[in-house]
Every structure is written in C-alpha cells, then in structure tokens.
Amino acid sequence: MSNRPSTARPNSASPRRPNTPGRPSSARPGSGRTRASPRGGSAGGKRFSKEPQHNAEEGYVRIYLRGRPVTNYLPSDVEDYDLNAKHPAPTEKLKLDWVYGYRGRDCRCNLYLLPTGEIIYFMAAVVVLYNVEEQNQRHYTGHNDDVKSIAVHPDSVTIATGQVAGHDPDEGKPHVRIWNSITMETLHVLGLGFFDRAVCALSFSKVNVGVHLAAVDESNEHVLSVWDWKKEKKLSDTKSSQDPVLACEYHPMNDEQIITLGKGHIHFWNTTGGKLVKKSGIFEKYDKPKFVLSLAFTGNGDVITGDSNGNMYIWGKGNTRISQAILGAHEGGIFSLCVMNDGQILSGGGKDKKVILWTADYQQSEVTQVTEATGPVRTLCKGKGEDFYVGTTRNAILSGNMGGEFNTLVQAHTEELWGLALHPTQGLFLTCGYDKNVIMWDFEQHKPMWNKLMEDGCQSAGFHPSGAVVAIGMTSGRWVALDVESQDLITVHTDGKEQHDIIRYSPDGNFLAVASHDNYIYIYSVTEEGRKYSKVGKCSGHSSFVTHIDWSADSTKLQSNSGDYELLFWDAATCKQIVISKETRDVEWATFTGVLGYPVCGIWPEGSDGTDVNTTARSANGNLLASGDDFGKINLFRYPVNHPKADCTSFKGHSSHVTSVAFNGDSTKLISTGGRDMSCMQWSVV
C-alpha cells in the first residue's frame, strides 16, 4: 500500500477513494484547514452526479462538483453553443524525455549497471535506464504506481520490478512485472491478487539460469514466495517474518537457498522438495543487531552481512553460524555491501557516510566519504574497473572510485514537491519542496544549475517577467524574492501564518499576487525590476483556501479558485472583488492554470469529487491544456476544454498526485511534478 495522501491540496481533507483504502489525509500536522463541505452533501460521502446545464439566455454553462454548482460564463463571441457536442482529444502526445530523481529515501537494492552501459533504477512509477556517457534515458512505464523493488536476471536483459497497490482497475493490486530491457516489452505479470500492500524485495535464481523468482511482500507476515516466472506459476510460499524484511537474495552458487534479512533476523531458506524450510542465523556470542541491513556474497560462497551496530559478519557457505566478525566496521548502520570484480569488498555507512574498501581477507584498505548534501549511502553498485555507483538516502546517485571525488549524476527533492516555475526567457525551470530546497534545472543538460537551502519548507514559485528575480512561497506564511544569478535574498515578507499555495507576478511585472491557505490573496506593487515591493492590500472574499490564480493579459485583473470550488475575480489595483462575473467573460488571461472556468469546464471526469484535478496549464500557443490529477496521470486536452466530459489522452509516470504542470515558452516541452513521489518529469510534445 502506498503511504500517500488523498491527493487534495495539502492541508485539505477529502473523502477516501474507494479503490485506494487506507491512504492518509494530506493535511499537515497542526493544520485546522479542511475542504468545505458542499451544499446538499450527504453524510455518507457519496459522489454527486448532477448533469451540466447550459443557459443560453444568460450565456453560461453550469457544472457541479460534489453537488455544488460552478457557473462558467461563455465569452460573448461564442454562438450556437452545444452542451453535448463532442470534444475530441488532441492529436499531440506527450513523450517522456527525462525523469529527475532516484528513490533512495526508503528503498534499497535498487541500483544496477547493465551491459549496455546504462544504470537502472526507479523513481515514482517509472523504471529509468540512464546512459551516463551518452546522456540519455530510456523508460519502462508499465507500472501504475510506486515501484518498490527490482531484480536483474542473470542474462542481464530481463528485469523484474515490483510495485505497490495502485490506481489501475485491472492491474491496481500489488504485482511483479517481468520485462525486456532492450525492447521495453512486458513479458509477464505475476501475483495480481496474491501480494499484499507492496512487493518490497525480488531476486532471480542464479545457477539454473534464472528460472525462478523469489519475492517478498509487505503484508503483516511478509510472505516469501517462489515463482516459475515464465509459466507465471507460484511454486511455493510461506510466512517470512512479522518484522520488516529489507532484502531477499538467491545464493549465487545454490538455487535451493534463499536468504532474507531485516529487523532482528537473517533467515536461510531451503527450497528442496517444493517447500520453503527456514533456518535462522545464530549470532551466538555476538550482539544480535536491531536490524540486519545488507548482504553480499564472496567468490567462495560465503555470505557477508552488515547491520545496524556497524558490524560485518561472515557466514560460511552452507552455514547458519558466524565464522568471522569485523566489529565496528562503521560508526552506525552498514546500509550496503558490494563485492567488486577483483574480490575486494565495499561497505557503505549510514551515520558515518563512509565508503570503505576491504581486501578479500577483510582488512581495511581505503576509506572515502559522501557529503552531507547528497546524504548517507543507501546502496552500492559496482561499475567498470574500480569505479562504482552510490545511491543515497537523499535520492541522489553518485559515481566515482576510492581515489577521487564523487560526481553527482542524479539529484532530487527528498520531501513533498509542489513548487514549479519555468524561466520566461531561458531553457531553465525551478522546483521547490517541503525539504526546503530550491533547485534551478537546465532543460537540455538535465542537471541543477544551482541549489539553495531555505529556512522553511517551500510551496510555490514564480518568476518575474525579466527572469532576473524569482519569488518563493513558503509553508510558514513567509515569502521571499531571490536574485536568480546570485541566489541572494532580495526581500523577505510574512503574510499570515499559513502556506502560500500560489505566487505569481503580473505579465507587466508591476504586481505580485500571493495566494494563501488563509483564504486571502495578498497584492504587492513591484518596482525596480522586481527588487522593491510595497503592499497594496489583500483580496478578501474566498471562504476556503486559495488554490489557483491567473493574471489578465493587461495585468489589471485576477481570477482565483478556492478549495470549496469558488471562481472569483478581482481588480488588482484596489483588491476589490468583481462581483458581476459576466463582466469578466471576455477577459484575456495571460495564463490559465486554474481548474474552474469556461475554458476548463470539461476537464472533470465522470464522478469527480472536486479534488481529483490538482493543476492545469495552457500551452503558450493556446492549442493545448494539460492537467495533473490524483491518480498520477497527466491528461492532455484540446484547448479550450469547453464541453463537459471532454476527451483527452492520458500519460502515466507519476505515482503520487501530480501537483504542478507547466509548458515551456514555445509549447514543445512540459514539466510535471509529483507530490509525495518527489519526482520531476520532462516531456516532449510530439
């Protein structure tokens, strides 16, 4: 089961969805904010199905979200509007170009080097094959939710990946997908209806050319199962442990032995006769660790383990007793072990962040260390020659060797991600998250240009039209403006005590609107190219938190959406509400990022509860609208989406709620961010 929020805006609460039981609310601790109850709502939380209405005399279309009416006035030049007209999907598609990030925070044993020169790992619902030398990525997108485990077949081509319970009606239960890493073709799907919550560990057998696959799920008993994967047949299964299981590996010299380890245990399983028979490792005179964290196999078949006490134990081949101990090998846990091609052993520490090279007879040879910024070692993977790769707990991948500094190949946010802004004139975009990190990325190089750590978690971002200044909205009620080139603070302001969901400059750069979770929109006058700010006032009228804002092309008006499905309009200079909505029907909006209004009234699928769609973006050429939903999908519409239940084309990759989408200036690329999946994805419009 994926530990994710119901995918409303943070600090809001909404009914749980029937296909994803047990997902916690996305409200932040301490927040009293909830999405307002709809008028006429039922205590049972049933979805409403009132049909859309068109009033030709008044010139509006009315849709209903959880029973609440949302009135959308048609532009005055729209004639002969047909409510039931078909709205076809666009001919354009999205092609996934790049996935920013790696899931190291809470997964392990998930980084391998393939003979193609690609490193393989996963982020969100995508398995990434990254060729570092050629600087390109390929992607396996067969999963519909978080990938949690991976195994590479002895043929180095066939891959097994396991996922959590997901959204798909047919393949939404936890399962394993077997696929070809050359063609990206799915070969087999295992365990639909068998696994519980998630598949957390996988291993192919070695000696018999990988005929069998072992898997462990995240049920209360952490069931271990063995499969003939080509026949999609389960051969045996047993309850493994009531405590967490962190790894599962076939012995490379004995296909009748599987080793599992985790909290307080290491188990040696014998598969002879089609049954799984367990023998527990005996620690005897040595301290039993709280966690056995990692294992590797030597050339002679011995098993090496690393534990939470920082000790390395050697278990003789075919034995369940410790034959040798290296006590205090690390200060703190040993998160990963890796046997190099020459028989030497790498160990990676958590607390001490050290990578230590040991000789084949377990003498310490060399020591190096990863930085605080990239985080402790999560997993180690041997590369070519003396080189190796390091996956870290801060979602980074490094490359290097014992003799030099590490090169950061992959970087990502480490907590929930909402903030996204595209540079107005350059091929750059900026993301900011609850991890307090603000990162400027390069579209072409796919790497950070700079990274700045803030004092508070970050919620939103927006560039000044000059591109020289960027405003960041915080989760604390503060907002700041940064110099893009130097990253120096230009100004710091506090408005209220709640997060600022949206922050956006007017097209002429003379105003800044800060939309807050306290129901207000704060307006500032901006001068000196974004370097001086004077408060104009605040827009007061919403009865729930503000979720989206857009400026008019002439920088005089604002439109805003709220958590209780209000669509309001404002005069920017006076902060007064424009109460006669018909007066805004012909306003040209510089951007369209809201989820309410005539141009987007068709984005809501049948049975929507009003929180299903989190974000939209109109392309710069005005031909397309992208939306991001609760189910990890990006939906591409023909703009304007002015007919209810419009057709769209959907694209998957994210596993959590899609929190932001944005097109670049020439409408050829789109950037999307995931909430709890912490990922950022770059797409081409084709």
Swiss-Prot record:
Broad class of where this protein is predominantly found: cytoplasm
InterPro entries reported in the protein's UniProt record: Beta-prop_EML-like_2nd (IPR055442), Beta-prop_EML_1st (IPR055439), HELP (IPR005108), Quino_amine_DH_bsu (IPR011044), Quinoprotein_ADH-like_sf (IPR011047), WD40/YVTN_repeat-like_dom_sf (IPR015943), WD40_rpt (IPR001680), WD_repeat_EMAP (IPR050630)
GO biological process, one term: microtubule cytoskeleton organization
Cell compartments where the protein resides: Cytoplasm, Cytoskeleton
WD repeats: 142-189, 194-237, 240-279, 287-325, 329-368, 412-451, 495-534, 541-580, 608-647, 653-685
GO cellular component, one term: cytoplasm
PROSITE patterns: WD_REPEATS_2, WD_REPEATS_REGION
Pfam family, one: Beta-prop_EML_2
SMART domains named among the record's database cross-references: WD40
Record keyword Transferase present: no
Keywords, alphabetical: Cytoplasm, Cytoskeleton, Microtubule, Repeat, WD repeat
Function statement: May modify the assembly dynamics of microtubules, such that microtubules are slightly longer, but more dynamic.
Family of this protein: Belongs to the WD repeat EMAP family.
Name of the protein this chain belongs to: 77 kDa echinoderm microtubule-associated protein
Biological source species: Strongylocentrotus purpuratus
